[in-house]
Amino acid sequence: MKTLATSAALALGTLLFAPSAHAAAMPLGNYQLLTNRYTTHAWTWAINLCQPDCVDVTATPRPVRMGVEFFGSAHLAGSTYTLVNDAPDGVICWGYTLPAHDVYSWDAVSLAGTVESTFDAGCNGSPGGVNTWTFALERM
């Protein structure tokens, strides 16, 4: 009888405290976005939980006057997070900016990824296109 009770307790403990399927989720906190995209400013991302397969991102430019803060939810599929942002300042031209549709994708463990930026028009009337940059998130 004692063996049965012990086995039941161990089984219950295994169910309650087993690693979840979300073990690949990134740690919450503040990160510096390291990228080859920007030369005029840097970004800080505050990462908070929004649901089991999602994190909320508050992206703040540094210095603040050099970019437009944005908010979004990054969804986890497998081990990859994806965040979509329609950036009013996604294309930086000499003296002005143009909008772009940015898709950030990064690995939940290595925190390295790419941002693909699609834009309808380029600087000085040049045609639209797609640019891809690499980035990494470094915990602050």
Predicted regions and their residues:
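Internal, hydrophobic beta-strand segments that form the core of beta-sheet-rich folds
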Residues: 101-121, 137
